[in-house]
Amino acid sequence: MNGRVFQFEWDEVKANANVRKHSVSFELARTVFNDPQLLTVADLEHSENEERWFSIGYATNGSILSVVYLWSDADPAVTKIRLISARNAWQTEIRYYQEGL
């Protein structure tokens, strides 16, 4: 995502619930943003009250994760990313990622 500095944040209760539900920590999920092939699209289906984004990429443990988040680039030097959900990517998502769709 264009060489900017990322600042990550999340709700700890939500982060703990995400580990219980999907077995993926937000600490691991944040590493997908280092993937130069990161696939990102607007999450229009879940963007009723806020603009959500959906990315698929490799995490540092070698797994391909799907991550939902909000982001703000109000500061031109820093992109703030608020993680909402993270899980192992589904097979169809992995195929999209591999095909660069």
Residue ranges and their predicted role:
Residues 1-101:
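Ribonuclease/tRNase effector modules and their secretory precursors
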